[in-house]
Structure formats: C-alpha cells, structure tokens
C-alpha cells in the first residue's frame, strides 16, 4: 500500500474501530512506521513519555511493562534513561512486535526481555506479572484503547506499582477518562492521579501543538 503524507498515518490510525482493524493497519505499517511517521512527522511521544517516567518515578525499579509496545521506541528511550530496568512489552500486532524485537540498548543488547502478542481490550494474562511499573505512549487514543481498558492493566501491577500512561488529549475528554479514574480511586484500586500534559510532536512539525495527557498514579492491590 502506498504511503504518501498521512495516507498511513493519523487519519487511518484514528479511523480503526476494532482490534482486527488495528492488526490489519499495523501489519501494513510496521516495517516503515519509524521512518514514514515517527521521523517524517517529528513524533516525540515515545521519548516524551520516557522522560516523564524518569522524572516522576523516583523509585529504583527492576521490571517494567511497556503497554502497546509498537515498534519499541518507548522502551528504547526508557532503556537509555534507566539502563538497569528489565523491560517486557505487549502489543496486538505481531508485525510491530517484530520491529520492537530489533531495538537495541546502548550496549547493543535487546531492549526487551520478552514480547507478548495481546489484545488489551480483554483481560490480560501474563506469567511475568506483577510489574513494578507500566508505561504507555500512543495506545490510548482514537480507535485504540479507551478508559475501560485501564482495569485490564491494573492486575499486572504490584501493590504500589506505577502507572504512567499517555492519552490523546481529545480522546481523554471525549471518552471520559477523568470519570473512570475517579471511579478507580473510589474503588480503592489506584491512588489519586496526577495529570500532566506533554507535546506529542517536535517544534517544526506540521502537527506541533498537539498534546497528550499523562496519567501518573500508583496501584493499590
């Protein structure tokens, strides 16, 4: 499929409706995602989330799970900031996970220890849980994961484990993430979250000014 401008980009990514739509889109896009979108559009979301994680997570962690791993950019950037952290990843697309498997740390070792093909709209089995933290960028957005999926992720966290999750700004408002977070606090499932804002694109990008919210909270298990 030809990829010119955003032909395979924001418009198509935001238009998917089902997990199968996601798998079809990213099967086409995986091999060129980093070059045709991340580099071409100056997309800094994975780097920005990793920087927020490094700033707000004050604990020394050993095991982190990357939710919606994609091509592995979030893990790659986090591994540079936290070189001692063991990273696992989950994504619905085997083709994207294939690209993530190729990502390297600065010492040329693999970024990820294990990669799992998972549909995150359902309960998520994982034999390596619980993790000390979950990180995610670009997954909670139009056509992808809604606020209800947060409940599927919490069982993967250890008690007091960190959740650092980016959410598309418009998606956060239209899908009622604030209400879901309030409900989780009321249930005693999470601590009161801090909501930050970050730029998704670099200055100079045609999309500069687009922002995401970052949910920062801790699990109570």
Q: Model-found features: residue ranges?
A:
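N-terminal, positively charged/glycine-rich alpha-helical extensions of SAM-dependent methyltransferases
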Residues: 1-32
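A short acidic, Gly/Pro-enriched loop at the edge of an enzyme's catalytic core
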Residues: 124-134
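Class I SAM-dependent methyltransferase SAM/SAH-binding core
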Residues: 63-124
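A short glycine-rich, Lys/Arg-flanked "PGG" loop and its adjoining helix->strand segment in the class I
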Residues: 148-159
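Conserved alpha-helix/loop element of class I SAM-dependent methyltransferases that forms part
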Residues: 42-61
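Class I S-adenosyl-L-methionine
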Residues: 189-221
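Class I SAM-dependent methyltransferase Rossmann-like catalytic core
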Residues: 30-44
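Conserved beta-strand signature within the Rossmann-like core of class I S-adenosyl-L-methionine
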Residues: 160-168
């Amino acid at each position: 499929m030809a990829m010119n401008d955003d032909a395979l980009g924001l418009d198509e990514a935001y238009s998917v409706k089902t997990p199968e739509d996601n798998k079809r889109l990213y099967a086409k896009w995986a091999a060129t995602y980093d070059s045709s979108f991340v580099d071409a559009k100056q997309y800094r979301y994975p780097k920005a989330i990793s920087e927020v994680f490094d700033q707000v997570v004050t604990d020394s962690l050993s095991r982190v799970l990357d939710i919606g791993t994609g091509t592995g950019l979030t893990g790659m950037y986090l591994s540079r900031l936290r070189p001692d952290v063991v990273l696992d990843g989950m994504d619905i697309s085997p083709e994207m996970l294939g690209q993530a498997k190729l990502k390297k740390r600065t010492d040329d070792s693999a970024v990820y220890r294990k990669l799992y093909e998972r549909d995150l709209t359902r309960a998520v089995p994982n034999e390596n849980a619980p993790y000390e933290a979950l990180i995610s960028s670009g997954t909670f957005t139009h056509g992808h994961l809604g606020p209800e999926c947060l409940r599927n992720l919490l069982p993967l966290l250890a008690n007091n484990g960190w959740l650092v999750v980016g959410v598309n700004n418009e998606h956060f408002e239209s899908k009622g993430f604030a209400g879901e977070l309030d409900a989780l606090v009321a249930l005693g499932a999470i601590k009161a979250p801090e909501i930050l804002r970050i730029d998704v694109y670099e200055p100079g990008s045609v999309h500069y000014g687009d922002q995401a919210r970052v949910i920062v909270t801790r699990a109570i298990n």
